[in-house]
Amino acid sequence: MIQFVIPSYQHVGAVSALDMFPTDYEPHIVVREHEEKAYYDAYGSRAKIITIPDDVNGIAGTRKAITDMYAGQRIWMIDDDTTIRMSSMRKRDDRRCVDKVNQLTREQFYELIQYVEDAMDCGYYHGHARLPIFKITSSWGNYRENSYGFTNTWYDLGKLTTEQIGYGKIDLCEDMYAFLNLINQGYPHLALFKYLVVSGKAQAPGGCSSIRSNSKHNRALEQINREFPEQARWKTSNIEKRKSLGEEDESLKVLRMCVSRKEKSEAFHKFNAIHPIAVD
């Protein structure tokens, strides 16, 4: 069964991701050694607390450590302020909406697990449930291939190695790097719309915000652009208006993903035969 893994740092008392799990499922929270007791006291009855050394570098290093520790397993890494919910189509404007009120029931949670287990069996060794920032219509279907997203990612670590994923090769924007890195090795990515996520406020205190700044963020994007120039392209409009990640003069840069392909993968055809892409 898929193991949910929640990397967390300086967020004792704010791990809202735990709200999505039924009582008979044990998620794992991965924390620095010096925070083990605080997290255990707060969440030990609801999750297994896993430690990594204090000197692990940032969120990218944390994700690398997780892919090392869980080698051979199927995992789903999810931000500590993120929960996965059901979605439905709103007929009046043909918009897919996330259920912001209700968590998954126990039955729905295990259906989600099976849905992604099926995706992995079909060849989708990495994927995510979408954060609905932009409008998702019925024409998008229940999922889309090679569409980038963040806040959560699943991996079949029986099929993918830490080296193949590439965490730790870039300090920030590590999920974007891993997404492109795996696609370019021939591993398609699956973005789910049937299930959507509710996530906390961007750059809340703690977590990766403790090491993020405009300059560090921009240097990471520049590295991604150098390695994947055709698929990670600069978005030039409204850069000056982007919210700053810190009190700096440097404007925040933005990349847009250009990776969609008309020809679908073998994994897509296998998964579509089990779970049709078309909205009911």
From Swiss-Prot:
InterPro entries the record matches: TAGT
Pathway: Genetic information processing; DNA modification
Listed Pfam families: TAGT (PF20691)
Highest taxon in the source lineage: Viruses
UniProt keywords, alphabetically: Glycosyltransferase, Transferase
EC number annotated for this UniProt entry: 2.4.1.-
GO MF assignments: glycosyltransferase activity
Biological process according to GO: DNA modification
Biological role stated in the UniProt entry: Transfers a gentiobiosyl-group on a hydroxymethylcytosine residue in DNA. Is involved in a DNA modification process to protects the phage genome against its own nucleases and the host restriction endonuclease system.
Protein name stated in the entry: Beta-glucosyl-HMC-alpha-glucosyl-transferase
Lineage: Viruses, Duplodnaviria, Heunggongvirae, Uroviricota, Caudoviricetes
